[in-house]
Structures are given as C-alpha cells and as structure tokens.
C-alpha cells in the first residue's frame, strides 16, 4: 500500500521496513470549501466521517405505556394525551377552543460536549394543517433550541434564542430553506408530506458559534434541508446552551376543528463517544448518625436541582452507608418523592444542586433500586455509574418559571426503632 504525504501531495517511496497504516482523514481534510455548508450527511456536524461509535444520551419509545419517567407534559383547556397501544405511540389531542394546548418535553436536558457533534432525531405524525393550528417538534425548551414548526398552512425551521435577554424566534419558511426545499425540485427530488410520519433530525456543532444542520430521513437517507450558520457571522453565541430537551407542542392559536399529533420516538446521540466530565460534590449525615423510625422509609439524603438551575445536568454517582447498630438495614433509591420537613442547602454557591439531610418524610415517587446492608460492618460504596450510567440524572418539570427540580432520595428502614445510620451521596455536575 502506497504511503501518501498530505502536505505536498506526493507518495513516499516503497520501503518494506515500514509498517503501512490505513488512515481515514476527517471528512473535511483537504476538502474544497463549500459556502452553503457541510452537505455530506455521512459526516457528522464537524465533518468527521461517521465511523465512530455513537453514545446514546437518551432514547424514548412507548412500547407498553406512556413513559412518564422520561417525559413531562402540560395540558391546557380540553387538551389530553393518550397511549395508543396498537401503534406504540402517544396521541396528543386538543379540542376546538382557542388556547387548547399539549406540551410534552423530556424530563432531562442532554449534555453537549464542545467539539463533538450532537445528533437529535424525533419521529412523529402531524395533524392536517389548518388555520389557527400550530405544531412544533424538535430539540428546544422555553428559551433556546431548533425545531420544525407548522403554523396555519406554513412550514418553518425555527431557531429560538435567549442570548439577547429575551426569547427570539427566527423562523425560516420552507420556500427559503437553503439546501433543499423538499418541493420535488430540490437535490433529493423529495416532496415533503407532513400528513405522513416523518423522521426529523438535526446535528449541532455548538461551541457557541457553530452550524446547525436540520433535515429529514427519507428512504433511509439523511436529507439536509436547512443549515443555520453562525461562525464568522455573529457576535457572541447563537443560543445560550446546546444542552436542551426533546419537545413536542400542539396548540390552538384560535378556534379550530380539533387536532391530534402522534408522538413516536426520540433519541439524542453524542457522536464520537462521550466522557462524563464535571466537578463532583457530596453530602452526608453527621457522624452521630440519622435516627431512624421503624416501619418507615426514612429520607436520609435527598437531592434536587436549585431554582433557576433546573436546566442543569447533575447525576448521582456513589453512595456509602454505615449502620451504628449491629442489625440489618434496608435502603431504597426513590425518584420524584414528595419530601417534607428539613432544610435544603447547597455545598457552595456555584452548585446547581441542593440537598436535604434532615427531612421528616418521603411520600410517593418511583422506587428504582433497593437492597440491604448490615450495620457495624464495612459496606463497599455503591457505584451508581456502573449500574445506571446517566439514567439517574436529576429531572425537572417543564420550565415555565423559576422552580426547583424533582427529587432523588435515599431512604433507610431499620430493624429496630431508633437505630442510626450514616449515609453519604456523591453526585457529578456536568454543567457549570
């Protein structure tokens, strides 16, 4: 195999003593500059050939029920959502009245790592277009993101940004898409029919100023339709953050005949792998222990995202226990319990998480893990990263105003009343 020197475009002489190594250059290496942007969908947002292992940050489908752990919803007026068991999806429905609305948003935001392409895909079927009906699907929140919108009879790709201090939506009409208008006369020859099920994709090279490609997957092929460019064009950043959520909206902006949108699947993928970074913090009970009541799940440590920081990314990583009596203890990990009593504190002002080690009760929620340990014995730390990855990321409801996030709680039940336990919990904050 000949060896090629890229710097001067020559081949090296054959030398049997040299090892010959195949190298695949990045998708943009030595390529001609294309003013309209990177149109090669076999390359990621940064032009790297898509041969690297994708790392799934989020995936959602509806095989047996509504996935309430992954999704939060807000219903206004006569709006409703219903699990469709035959089709394995969610039917989002609004009535005829102005103001009826369904909003479905993932309960987590997803970590963007600078220098790595972030690929987002959502599948759906829109309701037939009509006057006063607005439908949105994409990767966005109240403040920032990119999404597809059908408003009245018109179709747009929209960039939402709060970098100016106010929320500004920049809609690009289908007739103005800069790559393929999907009107049958574009490079793909495809005509977009939003009454049929679609796969919407977008990939981000954020870094604050990168490009965002948007498009559809048709017949197994990624078709780019519009690229939002920013580098060498803007001052500052184009959105506040690329760590956002998947979101679906169905809204009556006036009186309509009623409508149903179908929410199917979503995924968020870090292309080129993912390495969890960020500062770890921890909280623990006093060395004298937390006094437990028998026949009760005692909340020894709880976490939640702070008010104003609920789009942060924080993941519990490690738990340790020590029982002060030589008896058995049972512990549970509970998401979204209602915590009463105690004081919420934070380790330092830069932290996005607050903790409570003096709460009185934990009611409801979902038990995601439970086990036992013996007091007055060495208990190996429980490495949550190994068992759950990022699945325990702290969640929140749909953000409409500053509010605290949902809870993550460790409860302990003793063998005997007034037994004592010491627990510690370490978490990692991936946004700062």
Positions of predicted regions on the chain:
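Noncatalytic modules at the cell exterior or secretory-pathway interfaces
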Residues: 240-250, 317-319, 396-417
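Aromatic sugar-binding interfaces of carbohydrate-active proteins
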Residues: 147, 192-194, 201-287
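Extended, solvent-exposed segments with strong compositional bias
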Residues: 352-396
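Extracellular/lumenal carbohydrate-interaction signature centered on repeated Trp-anchored short motifs
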Residues: 109-120, 189-196, 401
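Extended, low-complexity segments enriched in Ser/Thr/Gly and acidic residues that occur primarily
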Residues: 1-74, 275-327
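C-terminal interaction-tip segments
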Residues: 130-152, 219-224, 403-406, 412-432
